[in-house]
């Protein structure tokens, strides 16, 4: 059996290279490969109860540390719920 290298692995490795230590998220369908990769590569997953909370937490981490804050959300309403925190991060120049 061969080891599978998925998109989640590539993403998590790239984030680690940037200094990211945690991903804020609400678990959901199409982003499961990110969770598997995060566990494999030793990245901390912080589960929240709402996508906006995950995105605001990521923005706060970016603002306080200078390291990009990361929120992983699923398609549809998950992305829609991150519009306000993404706008705040953009206006504040948060990484």
Q: What does each model-found stretch correspond to?
A:
Residues 1-95:
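N-terminal alpha/beta PP-like core and its mobile active-site loop of ThDP/TPP-dependent enzymes
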